[in-house]
Amino acid sequence: STQGVSSAASDVYKRQYLARLKYNYDDRYFLEGSFRRDGSSRFHKDNRWGNFYSVGASWNMKQESFLQDVDWLDALKLRASYGEVGNNMGVSLYGHMALYTIDKNGGEAALVKQSLSAPDIKWETTQTVDIAVEGRLFNRLNFQIGYFDKRSKDLLFEVRLPLSAGSYPWVADTAPMNLTQYKNIGTVSNRGWEISLNADIINNNDWKWNFGVDATFLKNKIVKLPDGKDILHGMQNYSEGHSIYEWYTYHFEGVDQMTGTSLYTLDPDKKATAEEAGALATINGTDYATATSYAKRDWAGSALPTVYGSISSALSWRNWDLNMLFTYSLGGKTYDGSYASLMGVSESGASGNAYHKDILNSWKEIPTGMTETSANRINPNGTPRADFHKSSDLNAASDRWLTSSSYLVFKNLNLSYSLPKSWLKNIGLEGLSLTAGVENLFTLTSRKGLNPQYSFNGGSDDTYVTARVYNFGLTVKF
């Protein structure tokens, strides 16, 4: 057989200079600052270097004289910081240069431009503000409450230009590809609150029980876009003031119980063309589209949860220890494309097709007593008829397939037993313990089989729920 031989070489470098200063006064006041200068050959020589700094301060309030005699307060600290970090990974090794590909022109070898030069691109910068208070109360309760604002600006993207800027052949006998160019576009903000509580509920000689919970509330917002113009991308519409995780899609009104047809909110500007195409339905004085080509897109919620976090428990009795960990997420929507693909009727292949059992709920006939003017003619939770020829319209991408992303996962259960040291003295061992545990004991979601943990942007992509793992262990100390 013929074997291929290839080689590659690249000329790229990154340099960093770092300075840091720390100051501590009387274990009460702490100050830290840093400055770094980063250089990368990925950028043009005029924009090669970026300067980034950070500063942080904390105040150990418990050390102050006015708090030292407060018995129920064991610790209290206030801290705040601001920092900048540069990123150059959004651009290729030679992204600021015009790149060429080898092709042919009239049967002769030729170099064809593939991307335009980008001498003006610069470092992408992430600026983070963090403010928090933490402490311990009654020698039992630890707490931490923090606010953060992480803002990324001058985001680096490879932008595909219009054909008027030029093109190049991608594959023979196919349409040409647009030229690309790297650009700094947009500013995105991620801000929110982090809360953590941890309590020693029981703490005596035999019994000890620690219980903890933490929660993160996150808001994402697009602060700035090039020229303030929206960017429509699939089922998202990147728009200033909105989140990059917000869904922007067609609204599924329900199923017409007289015909079994899916109904969508009509775009008023497309009413005439919808009527000409036979895709307009008027029910009780309201117009609907029966195909998304004539429907109106609108905001349909976010893939981001309202709150997410974990719950932990550590219980011990003499030589026994039982530890549990749960993770949770509340709010947010997942586009269940896997479920959608199992609900659409298509031509069967040699081995047939797979369908979800819910397809058995498809509309089959006009319900008894239903008329053209019935107030409940539209079933908002209905399943349209199974129709091979109209499946693409009946089961089109819309908010019908958005489902709750909320979940609760029993992440870890671990039981261990340590043999008494008095039993081990005669055999020369310092310690011996046995452990048994289960990971991913169960997952609770809105739809069986859905794995909303898979993706933060709300996709599903036929991913399995995380596998359950059993483990056993033996620890020996000599």
Language-model-derived ranges and their functions:
Residues S1, S7-I244, D393, A397-F478:
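Extracellular/periplasmic, surface-exposed regions of secreted and cell-surface proteins
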Residues S40, G331-G428, L432:
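Extracytoplasmic gating/loop element in the C-terminal half of outer-membrane beta-barrel translocons
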Residues E158, P226-G228, F326-L342:
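Short acidic alpha-helical/loop segments enriched in Asp/Glu that coordinate divalent cations
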Residues Y294-A295, V307-Y308, W320, D393-D399:
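Short, flexible active-site loops
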